[in-house]
Amino acid sequence: MKTAFRIGASALVISMAASATFAQDLQIENEDWWRTAGAQFEGVTIRGVTESTPPSSYISDVLAPKFEELTGIQVEVETTSWDQMYDKAIKDMEAGTGIYDMVYIEQDIVYAYLSRNFLVNLTDALAAKPEIAAPTYSEANFTTFADNFRGAEDGDLYGVPMEAFIKVYLYRTDLFGDPEIQAAFQEQTGRALEPAKTHEEYAEIAQFFTAYYQEKGEEIWGTTAQAHTGHPASWYEFFESVAPTYGVYNWGIDPANNYAASVENGGRMNSDEAKEALAWWLSMRDIAPPESVQSTWTEVGTTFAAGRAAQGLVYGENAAWIASDESKSRVVGNVGVALPPLEEGVLEAAEAGEGYIGYYDGGAFGLPVGSQNQDAALLFLQFMALPEVQEEWAVAAPRITLTSTYDSPKVQELNTELGGYYDMLRDQGRLFKGAPEYTFHAQLREATAPIFYQILTGEIAPEEGLDQMAAKAEEELTNLGYRQ
């Protein structure tokens, strides 16, 4: 989950690609079909609102002009901050004013939108209008990330994915591969230096690097930490990226057991595993760079890119520019990717579909039911998901939402530069999961986050804090009517 302060430097868009793709260079198959399909919408303008991120900028700068050229339909895409985007979209959909024909939907908010019937069923809409169903658009081509935007009961699609990435374990290949460092680590620990598979191994590596460079007087630490003491980024790091690696899923809440959060009532928010996870994470924070206590997802990325950490958990969209953009990163060519460290049995549970090992984030474009230009918007949403469009988009603003995109030669070339990140996304993305399907997402976070911040600042002991958070979660769920 990233609600604000996401990296959104528009300079990243297109510049990351070796050869920039502009609207006039984008080659679309079946151009005549698009011209014919768009002819009936002459004079129509469709409007969208989205967060200012590299993928969104590609929509406004490249896809919209190309779509206009082919169909004659004007496209206005408003890119803004997350809070402004959310505020504008939600107010429009609540009032049914039809200002926007397309809205950005973050993975973790879609369940609230579906519960309020804000979005058009795209599967049904296209089935009812075969004359505007693009011949090369296919729901079957979407990656499993699209499942986050399907209705729980009908399985139909309510949003076209436009960005998707996992939170991965990044490590410095130049440091891990340095013979002098390898020898020192071997002598100290009795084992070879390689990316950690367990939390114990990760901690050992982090402690080694922090001490190693402290002795040398250099500003390199053993790990990153997304541990801001007053921003939800830290809450999300723990519940979405750390707790699952200890086998604590869905924030430790059990919807099938009267939405229990506390161990006393059958939940796991304050379980022994959750407390062990928190103790481990706090110990890593304590040997991370000093800026970690004020770091959100953005600052973690810049810390790693500045060469100030040997390893860390980093969002995939940031991992891409860290590994490839020399104008912003000092570690280009020296970045490896791996699965996060795990407790015993967690990987096996994820492979069996009984758990997950980390966070799968991203968003989609949805069509509000109040839109007055639904058919024209349906055309554009399909256009976004064409295989030839997605190939260029994946190179310009690293993200993949179609399975066919992985096989593109351009994408494979970039995959090498990114240390195999796209291979991991393709082959092991199924082991990661988005936010729980909770319509009370924001309310529960806001109710418990203040206690979490008190843990981070040392006002409350970690174990006591988790006990208080579990009790507060159940109180909030009772007030909201979920817990009886």
Where are these regions (language model features)?
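Immediate post-signal peptide segment of exported/extracytoplasmic ligand-binding proteins
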Residues: 23-47, 68-69, 153-156, 210-219, ...
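Hinge/lid segment of periplasmic solute-binding proteins
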Residues: 24-40, 107-168, 238, 336-341, ...
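Glycine-centered hinge/linker elements that transmit conformational signals in sensory
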Residues: 201-210, 241-294, 336
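Extracytoplasmic "Venus flytrap"/periplasmic binding protein-like
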Residues: 62-142, 179-180, 311, 327-330, ...
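Short, polar/charged alpha-helical segment
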Residues: 31-37, 54-74, 174, 448, ...
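Long, aromatic- and glycine/proline-rich binding clefts that accommodate carbohydrate-like moieties
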Residues: 28-34, 45, 51, 335-344, ...
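Short helix-initiation/N-cap motifs at beta->coil->alpha
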Residues: 80-88, 197-201, 292-306
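Extracytoplasmic/periplasmic substrate-recognition and gating elements
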Residues: 65, 150, 155, 175, ...
